Amino acid sequence: MLALHEWGARADPPLLLVHGLTESATAWPDAVARWSSRYHVLAIDQRGHGASPRWDDETLARAPQTMQEDLEKTLALFSEPPVVVAHSLGGLVSLRVSVAWPELVRALVLEDVARPTGHWAPAPWFVEHQERFLDAFADGGAAERERMRRETSWSESEIEGWAACKRRVDRRYIREGTYLGEADLVSAINRLRIPTLYLAPRRGDMAPEPSEVTNPLVRLVLLDGVGHCVRRDAPEAYHGLVDPFIEAVFAGTGR
Protein backbone atom coordinates (compact mmCIF):
# COMPACT_ATOMS: atom_id res chain seq x y z
CA MET A 1 0.00 0.00 0.00
CA LEU A 2 1.02 3.59 -0.57
CA ALA A 3 2.18 5.72 2.35
CA LEU A 4 -0.68 7.94 3.47
CA HIS A 5 -0.21 11.15 5.50
CA GLU A 6 -3.04 12.97 7.26
CA TRP A 7 -3.89 16.24 8.97
CA GLY A 8 -7.02 17.64 10.57
CA ALA A 9 -9.99 16.00 12.26
CA ARG A 10 -11.17 12.66 10.94
CA ALA A 11 -14.80 13.72 11.32
CA ASP A 12 -14.34 16.55 8.80
CA PRO A 13 -15.01 16.17 5.05
CA PRO A 14 -12.12 14.35 3.33
CA LEU A 15 -9.65 15.73 0.80
CA LEU A 16 -7.03 13.54 -0.87
CA LEU A 17 -3.94 15.22 -2.35
CA VAL A 18 -2.03 13.48 -5.16
CA HIS A 19 1.38 14.95 -6.02
CA GLY A 20 3.35 15.10 -9.24
CA LEU A 21 6.66 13.63 -10.40
CA THR A 22 9.63 13.87 -7.95
CA GLU A 23 7.45 15.26 -5.16
CA SER A 24 5.64 13.66 -2.20
CA ALA A 25 2.78 14.02 0.26
CA THR A 26 4.81 16.53 2.26
CA ALA A 27 5.16 18.93 -0.69
CA TRP A 28 1.78 20.63 -0.06
CA PRO A 29 2.61 22.56 3.15
CA ASP A 30 0.73 25.79 2.45
CA ALA A 31 -2.38 24.05 1.12
CA VAL A 32 -2.41 21.68 4.10
CA ALA A 33 -2.10 24.60 6.53
CA ARG A 34 -4.99 26.33 4.81
CA TRP A 35 -7.33 23.32 4.57
CA SER A 36 -6.64 21.19 7.65
CA SER A 37 -8.77 23.31 9.99
CA ARG A 38 -11.86 22.57 7.87
CA TYR A 39 -11.16 19.25 6.20
CA HIS A 40 -9.63 15.88 6.94
CA VAL A 41 -6.65 16.26 4.62
CA LEU A 42 -4.88 13.13 3.42
CA ALA A 43 -2.02 12.89 0.94
CA ILE A 44 -0.29 9.94 -0.66
CA ASP A 45 3.30 9.33 -1.59
CA GLN A 46 3.00 7.85 -5.06
CA ARG A 47 4.97 4.65 -5.72
CA GLY A 48 8.69 5.39 -5.89
CA HIS A 49 8.28 8.64 -3.96
CA GLY A 50 8.55 9.46 -0.27
CA ALA A 51 7.89 6.48 2.00
CA SER A 52 5.92 4.42 -0.52
CA PRO A 53 7.08 1.11 -2.04
CA ARG A 54 9.78 1.12 -4.70
CA TRP A 55 9.35 -0.12 -8.27
CA ASP A 56 10.26 -3.59 -9.57
CA ASP A 57 10.30 -5.37 -12.94
CA GLU A 58 6.63 -6.30 -12.84
CA THR A 59 5.30 -2.89 -11.84
CA LEU A 60 7.59 -1.00 -14.23
CA ALA A 61 6.39 -3.09 -17.17
CA ARG A 62 2.94 -1.56 -16.70
CA ALA A 63 3.75 1.67 -14.90
CA PRO A 64 0.63 3.71 -15.82
CA GLN A 65 -1.67 0.87 -14.81
CA THR A 66 0.29 0.29 -11.60
CA MET A 67 -0.10 3.91 -10.54
CA GLN A 68 -3.80 3.83 -11.32
CA GLU A 69 -4.27 0.64 -9.29
CA ASP A 70 -2.29 2.12 -6.38
CA LEU A 71 -4.66 5.09 -6.22
CA GLU A 72 -7.75 2.92 -6.64
CA LYS A 73 -6.68 0.80 -3.66
CA THR A 74 -6.12 3.93 -1.56
CA LEU A 75 -9.52 5.38 -2.44
CA ALA A 76 -11.21 2.10 -1.57
CA LEU A 77 -10.07 2.61 2.04
CA PHE A 78 -12.17 5.77 2.47
CA SER A 79 -15.49 5.53 4.28
CA GLU A 80 -16.84 8.23 1.96
CA PRO A 81 -15.55 9.56 -1.39
CA PRO A 82 -13.09 12.42 -0.98
CA VAL A 83 -12.54 15.45 -3.14
CA VAL A 84 -9.28 14.62 -4.93
CA VAL A 85 -6.84 17.49 -5.51
CA ALA A 86 -4.04 16.55 -7.88
CA HIS A 87 -1.09 18.03 -9.75
CA SER A 88 0.68 17.04 -12.99
CA LEU A 89 1.42 13.28 -12.99
CA GLY A 90 -0.89 12.93 -10.01
CA GLY A 91 -3.54 14.74 -12.00
CA LEU A 92 -3.35 12.26 -14.85
CA VAL A 93 -3.54 9.27 -12.51
CA SER A 94 -6.47 10.84 -10.65
CA LEU A 95 -8.26 11.68 -13.89
CA ARG A 96 -8.01 8.11 -15.15
CA VAL A 97 -9.17 6.66 -11.83
CA SER A 98 -12.10 9.08 -11.70
CA VAL A 99 -13.23 7.99 -15.16
CA ALA A 100 -12.93 4.30 -14.29
CA TRP A 101 -14.37 4.50 -10.76
CA PRO A 102 -16.53 7.64 -10.38
CA GLU A 103 -18.11 6.26 -7.22
CA LEU A 104 -14.74 6.54 -5.43
CA VAL A 105 -14.27 10.29 -6.03
CA ARG A 106 -16.68 13.03 -4.94
CA ALA A 107 -15.13 15.72 -7.13
CA LEU A 108 -11.82 16.49 -8.79
CA VAL A 109 -9.45 19.47 -8.75
CA LEU A 110 -6.78 19.20 -11.45
CA GLU A 111 -3.66 21.36 -11.73
CA ASP A 112 -1.83 21.33 -15.08
CA VAL A 113 -2.25 17.62 -15.75
CA ALA A 114 0.66 15.75 -17.36
CA ARG A 115 -0.35 15.17 -20.97
CA PRO A 116 0.24 11.64 -22.32
CA THR A 117 1.50 11.36 -25.88
CA GLY A 118 0.86 7.69 -26.57
CA HIS A 119 4.39 6.50 -25.80
CA TRP A 120 5.03 3.27 -23.88
CA ALA A 121 8.68 3.87 -23.00
CA PRO A 122 10.46 6.81 -21.34
CA ALA A 123 11.82 9.51 -23.63
CA PRO A 124 15.65 9.57 -23.33
CA TRP A 125 15.77 13.39 -23.25
CA PHE A 126 13.24 13.47 -20.40
CA VAL A 127 15.11 10.85 -18.39
CA GLU A 128 18.38 12.75 -18.83
CA HIS A 129 16.74 16.00 -17.76
CA GLN A 130 15.20 14.46 -14.64
CA GLU A 131 18.41 12.68 -13.66
CA ARG A 132 20.40 15.92 -13.87
CA PHE A 133 17.70 17.72 -11.90
CA LEU A 134 17.69 15.14 -9.10
CA ASP A 135 21.50 14.99 -9.03
CA ALA A 136 21.43 18.64 -7.95
CA PHE A 137 19.88 17.53 -4.65
CA ALA A 138 22.60 15.01 -3.76
CA ASP A 139 24.00 17.48 -1.22
CA GLY A 140 20.55 18.45 0.05
CA GLY A 141 19.88 20.91 -2.74
CA ALA A 142 21.15 24.14 -1.17
CA ALA A 143 21.89 25.68 -4.57
CA GLU A 144 18.48 24.66 -5.92
CA ARG A 145 16.76 26.20 -2.92
CA GLU A 146 18.63 29.46 -3.50
CA ARG A 147 17.77 29.37 -7.19
CA MET A 148 14.06 29.05 -6.42
CA ARG A 149 14.25 31.93 -3.94
CA ARG A 150 15.73 34.10 -6.69
CA GLU A 151 13.57 32.96 -9.59
CA THR A 152 10.12 32.37 -8.07
CA SER A 153 7.62 33.94 -5.70
CA TRP A 154 7.11 30.65 -3.84
CA SER A 155 6.86 30.75 -0.07
CA GLU A 156 9.80 29.49 1.97
CA SER A 157 7.73 26.56 3.24
CA GLU A 158 6.87 25.52 -0.32
CA ILE A 159 10.49 25.74 -1.45
CA GLU A 160 11.59 23.62 1.49
CA GLY A 161 8.83 21.07 0.93
CA TRP A 162 9.62 20.91 -2.80
CA ALA A 163 13.34 20.37 -2.16
CA ALA A 164 13.13 17.97 0.76
CA CYS A 165 11.42 15.17 -1.16
CA LYS A 166 13.85 14.94 -4.08
CA ARG A 167 16.35 12.54 -2.47
CA ARG A 168 13.56 10.00 -1.83
CA VAL A 169 12.69 9.50 -5.50
CA ASP A 170 13.23 6.00 -6.90
CA ARG A 171 15.69 6.61 -9.75
CA ARG A 172 14.72 3.36 -11.41
CA TYR A 173 11.25 4.80 -11.96
CA ILE A 174 12.78 7.87 -13.59
CA ARG A 175 14.84 5.69 -15.93
CA GLU A 176 12.28 3.00 -16.75
CA GLY A 177 8.80 4.09 -15.69
CA THR A 178 8.26 7.69 -16.78
CA TYR A 179 5.97 6.95 -19.70
CA LEU A 180 2.28 7.83 -19.64
CA GLY A 181 0.74 5.46 -22.16
CA GLU A 182 -2.41 6.16 -24.11
CA ALA A 183 -2.92 9.74 -25.33
CA ASP A 184 -6.27 9.96 -23.59
CA LEU A 185 -6.31 13.36 -21.86
CA VAL A 186 -9.14 15.02 -23.78
CA SER A 187 -11.25 11.89 -24.11
CA ALA A 188 -10.89 11.21 -20.38
CA ILE A 189 -11.92 14.76 -19.48
CA ASN A 190 -15.03 14.47 -21.58
CA ARG A 191 -15.94 11.12 -20.00
CA LEU A 192 -15.84 12.38 -16.42
CA ARG A 193 -19.06 12.00 -14.47
CA ILE A 194 -18.10 14.06 -11.42
CA PRO A 195 -17.71 17.83 -10.89
CA THR A 196 -14.23 18.89 -11.96
CA LEU A 197 -12.21 22.10 -11.76
CA TYR A 198 -9.17 22.11 -14.06
CA LEU A 199 -6.55 24.87 -13.65
CA ALA A 200 -3.62 25.38 -16.02
CA PRO A 201 -1.31 28.12 -17.31
CA ARG A 202 -2.61 29.91 -20.38
CA ARG A 203 0.81 29.70 -22.01
CA GLY A 204 1.45 26.09 -21.04
CA ASP A 205 1.69 23.20 -23.48
CA MET A 206 -0.27 20.45 -21.72
CA ALA A 207 -3.82 21.67 -21.14
CA PRO A 208 -6.55 21.00 -23.70
CA GLU A 209 -7.94 23.81 -25.79
CA PRO A 210 -11.14 25.21 -24.24
CA SER A 211 -13.05 24.20 -27.37
CA GLU A 212 -12.02 20.56 -26.79
CA VAL A 213 -13.71 20.41 -23.39
CA THR A 214 -17.36 19.60 -24.08
CA ASN A 215 -18.20 18.02 -20.71
CA PRO A 216 -20.58 20.32 -18.76
CA LEU A 217 -19.24 18.92 -15.47
CA VAL A 218 -15.73 20.23 -16.20
CA ARG A 219 -14.68 23.86 -15.74
CA LEU A 220 -11.34 24.63 -17.40
CA VAL A 221 -9.65 27.82 -16.17
CA LEU A 222 -6.50 29.06 -17.93
CA LEU A 223 -4.51 31.55 -15.86
CA ASP A 224 -2.03 34.22 -16.92
CA GLY A 225 1.34 34.71 -15.25
CA VAL A 226 1.72 31.21 -13.85
CA GLY A 227 3.76 28.16 -14.71
CA HIS A 228 3.31 24.44 -14.21
CA CYS A 229 2.69 24.74 -10.46
CA VAL A 230 -0.22 27.15 -10.25
CA ARG A 231 -0.76 26.84 -6.50
CA ARG A 232 2.82 27.92 -5.76
CA ASP A 233 3.09 30.62 -8.41
CA ALA A 234 -0.26 32.26 -7.59
CA PRO A 235 -1.65 30.87 -4.32
CA GLU A 236 -4.35 33.49 -3.93
CA ALA A 237 -5.66 32.94 -7.46
CA TYR A 238 -5.49 29.18 -6.95
CA HIS A 239 -7.33 29.19 -3.65
CA GLY A 240 -9.75 31.84 -4.87
CA LEU A 241 -10.97 29.26 -7.39
CA VAL A 242 -10.37 25.97 -5.60
CA ASP A 243 -11.64 26.75 -2.10
CA PRO A 244 -15.16 27.84 -3.16
CA PHE A 245 -15.37 24.83 -5.48
CA ILE A 246 -14.57 22.41 -2.65
CA GLU A 247 -16.96 24.18 -0.29
CA ALA A 248 -19.78 24.00 -2.83
CA VAL A 249 -19.18 20.31 -3.47
CA PHE A 250 -19.47 19.40 0.20
CA ALA A 251 -22.36 21.82 0.78
CA GLY A 252 -24.26 20.03 -1.96
CA THR A 253 -23.91 16.72 -0.12
CA GLY A 254 -24.83 18.01 3.32
CA ARG A 255 -21.25 17.81 4.67
Task: Report the location of each language-model feature.
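Flexible "cap/lid" loop of the alpha/beta hydrolase fold
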Residues: 95, 99, 104-137
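Conserved alpha/beta-hydrolase catalytic His-Asp/Glu region
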Residues: 119-124, 136-190
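Gly/Ala-rich beta-loop-alpha elbow adjacent to hydrolase catalytic centers
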Residues: 86, 90, 94
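Catalytic active-site module of serine/aspartate enzymes centered on a nucleophile-bearing elbow/loop
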Residues: 217-255
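Conserved loop-alpha-helix segment in the C-terminal half of the alpha/beta-hydrolase fold
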Residues: 195-232
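Active-site loop/oxyanion-hole signature of alpha/beta-hydrolase fold enzymes
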Residues: 33, 42-85, 240, 244
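Conserved catalytic-core motifs of eukaryotic protein kinase domains, centered on the activation segment
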Residues: 27-29, 52-59, 120-121, 209-210
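Conserved HGGG/HGGXW glycine-rich cap/lid loop of the alpha/beta-hydrolase fold
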Residues: 5-54
